[in-house]
Amino acid sequence: DNMLIEGIYQMISQFEYYNITSIFVFDGKPPVEKNDVIQERRLVKREAEQKYYDTKDLIEKKELQDTCTLKREMEVLRKKIVKVSKSDTQKVKQLLSLMGVSYYECDGESDSICAFMVQTNQAYACLSEDMDLFVYGTRRVLRYLSLLKSTVVIYDIEGMLLTLGLTFKDFQDICVLSGSDYNKKDAIDFNCSLNMFTKYRESGVITSYGDWMIEKKHMDSDGFKRAIELFDISHITIERDRFIKSDGNNNKLKEFLETYGFIFGISNIKDTSSLNYIKF
């Protein structure tokens, strides 16, 4: 809990230092098509949690001489089993309001909203580790943010498509056919999808790759088309009443952070990025 608040605070402070205006977008209820993926992720998380505690027991019982490798493995597992509760989410929203950072509360999943904001120039890029952002057609996706090094990797989808020699429709069809969060059961192997795409190109047909795969009976029509529909952002609208904005409050922000173990030095506080603290 403390690490979550500290991490978000440090990230926003770094954004402000580089004059980056951030908008946080919170998920709503996922579509029913994602239920299988959600259940699968819960199972993976439970298995990782069990492995984490088994490894911890080995280290505590000192049954192994070299524990460095196990400790590194534990850190990887710990990140996999992190759970963000509704209470955690509310505390993050409170922090954002106190720092004067805007956020948007989605009715459904946030991916389509993030993609739409970038596509309509309401945002420059989307910071996310979710690969589905590419399938939505998000022009710029930021990944691998390092607060320690102040670095991030930017993916430009137009440059990617140019390098790959693909249209966006081809790229989207390949990704969906290979399996997205919405059609895992109907997916085919990625390499198989690429091999079939080569045959599709060689055929010289004018239909889309996805339609060609359906015609050849390599893909379930309903599952594929439903997944493609879910990645369509042309119908998306930004509901202004879901945008939460605040001017921030430094005094209340300081009080809030102190409850999480932040200790502040004496300074003339004029903005949130100048709050100097020592964290224990």
Label each PLM-derived region with a short phrase.
Residues 67-79, 126, 136, 261-263, ...:
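Charged, low-complexity C-terminal accessory regions
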Residues 150-280:
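Non-catalytic nucleic-acid-binding/docking modules located in mid-to-C-terminal regions
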Residues 27, 132-133, 137-142, 149-158:
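Conserved beta-strand -> loop -> alpha-helix junction used to position metal-binding or nucleic-acid-contacting
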Residues 40-46, 141-149:
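A short alpha->loop->secondary-structure connector
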Residues 124-132, 148-151, 164-167:
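A polyampholytic, Gly/Pro-enriched intrinsically disordered region
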